[in-house]
Amino acid sequence: MALKHYKNSDSTVFNDAKALFDLNKNILLKGPTGSGKTKLAETLSEVVDTPMHQVNCSVDLDTESLLGFKTIKTNAEGQQEIVFVDGPVIKAMKEGHILYIDEINMAKPETLPVLNGVLDYRRQITNPYTGEVIKAVPGFNVIAAINEGYVGTLPMNEALKNRFVVIHVDYIDGDILKNVIKEQSLLQDDKQIEQIIKFNEDLRTMSKQGQISEEAASIRALLDLCDLITVMPVERAIKRTIIDKLEDEREQQAIYNAVELNF
């Protein structure tokens, strides 16, 4: 099945990402949570017909999660031997694929320097577990994503950031958002879609003012909401997809107020 492509009224977002990819530059997608950064990376992967290996960063990310690990395997002769299982970084390098590092600023700063040689002109790494020197084959590219100011994120190391070219990815809106809702959700009623878009605009404004978290205004939450509206009242759908995810009562009340204004 064909991938539902990333869309943005600002065509330079995708066009510049594609141009950087063609130049084999490391791309850092920077923007609010749920703005479509992963969708943009997936679309690039499909457009250039190159598979993508994904790393999801967290404070628990370690070198083994990136590069791979040793394990015991029984060979064809029935004997046990120690083998190395390639992780996403080494797989992408050996196969000439895309490496996508999601939420790179969630990782502990001391975990990522192992990638320095991968991200600069050398495009190579010495596997600390085997001693093997791996040089990336043609086609290998790196895309990373960052949610600045999100809970749990850390300032990105300058030496690491300098290895990337940055593209800002903001939320989509207007007719583009309307088309995305129709293509990627079950909701098709134009009047309801217009109401939802206006409601989402209010959430985005509140998010920028710090009244609610970014996730409440994300495209992911919006598409879930549109699906639920087709099977339940809009107020209950908003409660299930947005309000009940929030812990702060003030954030919840702010969204209840927006519901009263829009529906």
UniProtKB/Swiss-Prot annotation:
Task: List the source organism.
Answer: Staphylococcus aureus (strain NCTC 8325 / PS 47)
Q: Does the keyword ATP-binding apply?
A: yes
**Annotated residues for binding of ATP:** G31, P32, T33, G34, S35, G36, K37, T38
One of the Pfam families matching this protein, by short name: AAA_5
Q: Which family is it part of?
A: Belongs to the CbbQ/NirQ/NorQ/GpvN family.
UniProt keyword annotation of ATP-binding present = yes
Alphabetical list of InterPro entries matching this protein: ATPase_dyneun-rel_AAA, CbbQ/NirQ/NorQ/GpvN, CbbQ_C, ClpA/B, P-loop_NTPase
Keyword list (alphabetical) reads: ATP-binding, Nucleotide-binding
Alphabetized GO MF terms: ATP binding; ATP hydrolysis activity
This chain belongs to the protein called: Uncharacterized protein SAOUHSC_01413
Q: What else is known?
A: Disruption of this gene leads to an increase in hla (alpha-hemolysin) transcription and proteases production.
